[in-house]
Each structure stands twice: as C-alpha cells, then as structure tokens.
From Swiss-Prot:
It catalyses: UDP-N-acetyl-alpha-D-muramoyl-L-alanyl-D-glutamate + meso-2,6-diaminopimelate + ATP = UDP-N-acetyl-alpha-D-muramoyl-L-alanyl-gamma-D-glutamyl-meso-2,6-diaminopimelate + ADP + phosphate + H(+). Belongs to the MurCDEF family. MurE subfamily. NCBIfam families: murE, PRK00139.1-1, PRK00139.1-2, PRK00139.1-4. This is UDP-N-acetylmuramoyl-L-alanyl-D-glutamate--2,6-diaminopimelate ligase. One of its GO terms (cellular component) is cytoplasm. Carboxylation is probably crucial for Mg(2+) binding and, consequently, for the gamma-phosphate positioning of ATP. The gene is murE. UDP-N-acetyl-alpha-D-muramoyl-L-alanyl-D-glutamate binds at L27, S29, H44, Q45, A46, N157, T158, T159, S185, Q191, R193. GO terms for biological process: cell division; cell wall organization; peptidoglycan biosynthetic process; regulation of cell shape. The modification N6-carboxylysine is found at K225. Catalyzes the addition of meso-diaminopimelic acid to the nucleotide precursor UDP-N-acetylmuramoyl-L-alanyl-D-glutamate (UMAG) in the biosynthesis of bacterial cell-wall peptidoglycan. HAMAP family: MurE (MF_00208). Disulfide bonds: none annotated. The keyword Transport does not apply.
Length: 495
C-alpha cells in the first residue's frame, strides 16, 4: 500500500494539517497501534470518544473525532502532541475517508452490490463463480464471509463497518481480485457503510419481513433498501420484477434491467429485460429456458427451487448488463455449484433427502418449503426455530407457514441468545392452528437427529434457519454446532 499522510487524506475537508504519515486506520482503540489513525465515532453501541486517551497512550499518529456542531467542523487541536481533527457528520463521511485512505479500491475492480431480504448470498456466490469461469479473479463479501473464491474467511456481519469494507476491498485488490460480489444489508445502507463505493451494478432480489426490530416497520425497511439506488453510485440496476417492491422501483429506474420468472415483464415497456419462458424441476435441479433483450437460451441448474431460478436469472442479467457475452455465459452455466448452506442437499442410499437452508424469515421459509416440495415424493419435514433477541413478530408467522407447507413440523431452538428457549417456541406455536400436532424438541442437535432418523427414504427433511453457520448462540456463549455436519454424519457422507 502506498504511503498515506494526514494532510493529503483530509485535503477535501480540512486545510493546514501536518503531512504526518499514517500506518493504518481503525475505529477500535484496542487494536490501535503506533502510527495509526484512530477515528473516534459515536456508534450505536459505543462512543469512540471515550477511548481517545487509550489510543494516545498506544501511540497513534492522529485522531479524527465527531465535531459537536457545524461551528467546530474542521477544527484542529492537539492532545499530548497528537493532532485531533474534528469533523461533523463523521459517520456519513467515514466511507469516503476510508476510500481515500485505501486508494479507492472499488474503482480498481468490478464491484456488484446485491441487496434484498433473501437471496443475497446465493446471488453473490453465483456472480463470483460465473465471472471467474469467464476469466475474472473473483471475490465475495457477505454473510458467509469475505475473500477470494475458495479462500473465504468467516465474518460476524453481512456488511462490516465503513472502514472494514474499504480495508477488505483493498486487500482483495492487492490479492489480484478483478471482480467482487458484495451483499449489502439494510443496516449497512442506513449506517452509511457503503456510501462511497463505486458499484458497477446493483441487484435487488426481493423484500419481505425481516429486521423490524431495527427498522420499526416495512416502510422504513424498504426506504433503507432503496438508498442503494437513491443515494449511492449504483451503476447498472438489475431488479426483480416478480417482487411487488421491485415493480414499484422499476417505475423510478427507467434504465434498469427487469428480471422475471413469472411473466411480470412487457418487452415494449422495458428497454432491457430477461424472463424465464419455461422451468422444469427435477431431482438434479432445474432446466431453465429463458428469453431476454440479449437473446435466448437454456440453462441446466444444479440449484433447488423456484427462488434459486430467480437468483440465477438475476446473476445472468447482471453479467449481461456488464457486457459479458451470452454465448460464454451459456457455455459455463452448467459448472455453477450449489452454495454452502443454501438449499444444500445431502443424500445417501436408503436414507431421506436432507436439505439445509439459511431460511430465517417467513418469506424465505415458505419459499424453501415450496422448493423442497418440488423434489419430494414422500413426506416433507420441517425442522426450525427462531432467533432470540430479534424480531418477535415473525415467529407466529413462521409457525403458520411451516404448518401450512410441511407435512411434519419439528419446532426447536435456533440461536436463543439471552431469551428463554421455551418462550421462543411458544411464540412460534401461537401462530399454528393445531399446535398439538407439532413436535417440540428444545435441543437442536437432538431435534435434527430425531427427524432424520424417523423420516423414510422417500421423505425430504428441511432443516431451516442456520444454513452455513457452524455455531449456536445460547445465552452469551457461542457453541460449536452445525446443521450441515450433523446431517452429513447421520447420512454417512462428507459435509
């Protein structure tokens, strides 16, 4: 990384600073070291200003802190020989600051944003896989982790802090990444974590109930997602026209690519479009015949379910909009791999088919069950729970959906966190018409084991809620546990 100094970094906002060299940029006083730039933001959980003395004691070269008001914006002070710069609206400016610090990494790769309630992980993975098959060196950032394909490192949040995002992108560019697919959460948009990124394209998958414990209601949740197109450098816009919100947004995005598998496209009204003409589901996945403003074709997909057809079409439309040839995309489509913990199928002779999925919202659970039904000759089982310390309103909704779409429902723990597990289960049962027919088993490993052992060989067992996760949060403890590993062990296969 080239040399960085305080004067050049803050030149757009503040004059008269020393050209003091900066080693690294951090929001965390615990890792701040000699020569670093410490940014003391007022966060949602902590106030970085409280840790300025600690950062100074650890030898930081400079500090940027939230200004109290416009009058103090750009003010420069000194504490124990360390320059302290005051900036107003620091959280809003942080992405731009970090972008300058890390030499604008989003301008040095082809970066695609994917937002929506469901489908972000699968769509980003498909984009990264497909682009790499076409010669790019591709990376992903999101729920599963960050990194080059095959070298992904797990992360805590879908979208990291504004500094983390720019830092990771810079690291990926340094490793040779030429293409990146990034999940962008509603939290990340509202908290300005991707505000200064230059996206080559931005994809909207769908919108359904989630995160209302944070946003309050669906209107605010939608407004958060819309920020990607209204206030960010979004590049090409690719929008799911099968989603009600997506159809509304298309009216405000005349240059967007409309994507549909349900016929919600009028080629005379949309300049660029892609739609499924016919989809055949089978035990290996699906055969998809499509038409588009770029041409038509047929794809053999190894992914399960209608919503994954939608995810694949969104990825295809994005790559077409970015200029990748349709002929090359069709040649490589059959080599796309299913995504870890996203409708991931485990099979063994004489055993039920087990599907592990991350579905943890009402809409995602319904779609996962509908997808599993397409591949089920016997009974459809559903093993699921709901996370503690999160939106309680979705629990009875998910209970009702499981009861409607599955033949046998097993309600268990998800990540109970600091809530009483039985209280969460009772919230789920409250949404069911006949809760007496539901099997309740609080230990998740026991519930999964019981379901797989009791299911017949022509049954399908959907284990929903945790997907790729290899832990369970009980109280404040993070315990080792994986639905994937549990299912694979019981079937005698490798996860």
């Amino acid at each position: 990384m080239a040399d960085r100094n305080l004067r050049d970094l803050l030149a757009p906002w503040v004059a008269g600073l020393p050209a003091r060299e900066l080693r690294e940029m951090t929001l965390d006083s615990r890792v701040a070291a000699a020569g670093d730039l410490f940014v003391a933001v007022v966060g949602h959980q902590a106030d970085g200003r409280r840790y300025i003395p600690q950062a100074i004691a650890q030898g930081v070269a400079a500090i940027i802190v939230e200004a109290k008001d416009e009058a103090t914006d750009g003010e420069i002070r000194e504490m124990h020989g360390v320059p302290v710069v005051y900036l107003s609206q620091l959280n809003e400016r942080l992405s731009a600051l970090a972008g300058r610090f890390y030499h604008e990494p989003s301008e040095n790769m082809r970066l695609v944003a994917v937002t929506g309630t469901n489908g972000k992980t699968t769509t980003t993975q498909l984009l990264a896989q497909w682009s790499q098959l076409l010669g790019e060196t591709s990376a992903v950032m999101g729920t599963v982790g960050n990194g080059l394909l095959g070298k992904v490192i797990p992360t805590e949040n879908t979208t990291g802090s504004a500094v983390d995002v720019q830092h990771v992108l810079a690291s990926l560019v340094a490793q040779g990444a030429t293409f990146g697919a990034m999940e962008v959460s509603s939290h990340g948009l509202v908290q300005h974590r991707v505000a200064a990124l230059k996206f080559a394209a931005s994809v909207f998958t769908n919108l359904s109930r989630d995160h209302l414990d944070y946003h309050g209601d669906m209107a605010h949740y939608e407004a958060a997602k819309w920020m990607l197109y209204s206030t960010h450098h979004h590049g090409q816009a690719i929008v799911n026209a099968d989603d009600e919100v997506g159809r509304r947004w298309l009216a405000s995005l005349p240059d967007a690519v409309a994507v549909s598998m349900e016929g919600h496209i009028n080629p005379n009204c949309h300049g660029r479009w892609l739609k499924a003409e016919a989809v055949e589901y089978h035990d290996r996945g699906a055969t998809i015949r499509f038409a588009s403003s770029w041409g038509e074709g047929e794809i053999e997909s190894r992914l399960m379910g209608a919503f994954n057809v939608s995810n694949l079409l969104l990825a295809l439309a994005t790559l077409l909009a970015l200029g990748y040839p349709l002929t090359d995309l069709l040649k490589t489509a059959a080599r796309l791999q299913p995504v870890c913990g996203r409708m991931e199928v485990f099979t063994a002779p004489g055993k039920p088919t087990v599907v592990v999925d991350y579905a943890h919202t009402p809409d995602a659970l319904e779609k996962a069950l509908q997808a599993a039904r397409l591949h089920c000759a016997g009974k459809l089982w559903c093993v699921f729970g709901c996370g503690g310390d999160r939106d309680k309103g979705k629990r009875p909704l998910m209970g009702a959906i499981a009861e409607e779409f599955a033949d046998i429902v097993v309600v268990t723990d998800d990540n109970p966190r600091t809530e009483e597990p039985r209280a969460i289960i009772n919230d789920i049962l409250a949404g069911m018409l006949d809760a007496g027919q539901v099997r309740v088993m609080e230990g998740r490993a026991e519930a999964v084991t019981n379901a797989i052992m009791q299911a017949k060989d022509n049954d399908v067992v959907l284990i929903a809620g945790k997907g790729h996760e290899d832990y369970q949060i009980v109280g404040t403890q993070r315990l080792d546990y994986s639905d994937r590993v549990t299912a694979a062990r019981l079937l005698g296969v490798i996860a």
